[in-house]
Curated annotation (Swiss-Prot):
Subcellular location: Cytoplasm
GO molecular function, one term: DNA binding
SUPFAM superfamilies (alphabetical): YebC-like
Pfam family name, one: Transcrip_reg
InterPro entries: Integrase-like_N, TACO1_YebC-like_2nd/3rd_dom, TACO1_YebC_N, Transcrip_reg_TACO1-like, Transcrip_reg_TACO1-like_dom3, YebC-like
Protein name per Swiss-Prot or TrEMBL: Probable transcriptional regulatory protein BT0025
Keyword Transcription included in the entry's annotation: yes
Originating species: Borrelia turicatae (strain 91E135)
HAMAP family recorded: Transcrip_reg_TACO1
Biological-process GO terms, alphabetical: regulation of DNA-templated transcription
Family assignment from sequence similarity: Belongs to the TACO1 family.
Keyword terms: Cytoplasm, DNA-binding, Transcription, Transcription regulation
GO cellular component, one term: cytosol
Lineage of source species: Bacteria, Pseudomonadati, Spirochaetota, Spirochaetia, Spirochaetales
């Protein structure tokens, strides 16, 4: 019986992981299709599509799925014309700032759901500009130090004009201005294959909480991310794996 119980637990966990992965894939496919619809299916000339495809690859989306999403967006159907991009500024419990990016075909549904999730978890919507000033739009390029020597990445990144470089564990992050992101990422790509390359909102300062407070905020963020219309939740929470 114990073996059966263990196997059932494994299956449930696998099912939950598969469901989460499918939800991520659905959001990525939508973003790829919209990007292709708006700027064409050529990755080289469509920077938004290039970033969306890169995210999909990092998430291990099958190549066929990516290609189908590009074809769907760059075809003659009406995808994209009925979708809207929405950005909400909000507060989680304990003053954590949130920027919630959505892609939806129904503004009222999205607004209602986002507001409901926030209010049920102790958060609240903010006015436009209430938290966005806490974040800076930057280029973010991440590499695995298991693949490349740290000193080589640093040397080339500084030569390319990177603003900042951070390394932690087996990852190194190169920060650029939003304006120079494309040029710098292309320059570095001649020698290194990045794990992540995107325009990101980076908090000027991060907010530290105790474990109980942090878990409450992370639970809210997860609930928001579980909503299909939410593409991304940016926050200024300092996430610490273990708090004594």
């Amino acid at each position: 019986m114990s073996g059966h119980s263990k196997w059932s637990t494994i299956k449930r966990k696998k099912g939950a992981l598969d469901a989460k992965r499918n939800k991520i894939f659905t959001k990525l496919i939508r973003e790829i299709s919209i990007a292709a619809k708006m700027g064409g299916g050529d990755i080289e000339s469509n920077s938004r599509l290039r970033l969306a495809v890169n995210k999909a690859r990092v998430s291990n989306m099958p190549k066929d799925n990516i290609e189908k999403a590009i074809k769907k967006g760059s075809g003659d159907d009406n995808i994209g014309s009925e979708y809207f991009e929405l950005t909400y500024e909000a507060y989680a419990p304990h003053g954590v700032a949130l920027i919630i990016k959505c892609l939806t075909d129904n503004k009222n549904r999205t607004a209602s759901e986002v507001r409901s999730v926030l209010s049920k978890s102790g958060g609240s919507l903010g006015a436009p500009g209430s938290v966005s000033y806490m974040f800076h739009k930057k280029g973010l390029i991440s590499y695995s130090l298991d693949k490349y020597p740290e000193d080589e990445i640093i040397e080339l990144a500084l030569e390319a004009g990177a603003e900042d470089i951070y390394s932690e564990g087996s990852q190194i992050e190169v920060i650029t201005s939003a304006e120079n992101f494309e040029a710098i990422s292309s320059f570095l790509r001649t020698k290194f294959e990045e794990d992540i390359a995107e325009i990101a909102l980076i908090p000027g300062n991060k907010l530290s909480l105790n474990k109980e407070q942090m878990d409450k905020v992370l639970a809210l963020i997860e609930k928001l991310e579980d909503f299909d219309d939410v593409q991304e939740v940016v926050h200024n929470l300092e996430i610490i794996d273990e708090i004594n």
